């Protein structure tokens, strides 16, 4: 990813411009700077050095983020390289991961994830609503 759309969209909204959505079906994970710090600290304190942790994050629809920001939206066509959904763990990687402390971890023993499991923003079981996004936007 090249980063968050938040600063770009906030700038456009402040200028009275519309934001462009290239894929109305697009979803993303909501990952705050504080969440990133918590993940790094947990990993350093609680995991052996050869492990990798992936956070369990809520997803949101990009159209609902625009709605939460009260943005005027222009729809464009999908561009080369655009992904509809973010994928944190592919189905072929998931055999190496387990669930631990509300995260996905590679490199420790434990209960395996179901065969073919994929951790994607489009198939996630945690979703932020427009109201949730409005609350989250107040703190970032």
What positions do the PLM features span?
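Strand-loop microenvironment adjacent to phosphate/nucleotide-handling motifs in alpha/beta enzyme folds
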Residues: 2-140
């Amino acid at each position: 990813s090249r980063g968050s759309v938040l600063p770009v969209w906030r700038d456009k909204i402040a200028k009275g411009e519309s934001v462009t959505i290239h894929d109305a079906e697009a979803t993303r994970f909501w990952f705050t700077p504080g969440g990133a710090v918590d993940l790094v600290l947990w990993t350093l304190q609680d995991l052996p050095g050869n492990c990798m942790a992936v956070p369990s994050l809520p997803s949101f629809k990009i159209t609902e983020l625009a709605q939460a920001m009260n943005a005027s939206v222009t729809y464009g066509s999908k561009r080369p390289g655009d992904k509809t959904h973010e994928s944190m763990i592919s189905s072929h990687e998931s055999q190496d991961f387990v669930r631990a402390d509300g995260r996905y971890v590679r490199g420790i023993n434990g209960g395996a994830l179901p065969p073919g499991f994929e951790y994607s923003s489009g198939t996630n079981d945690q979703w932020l609503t427009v109201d949730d996004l409005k609350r989250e936007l107040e703190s970032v």
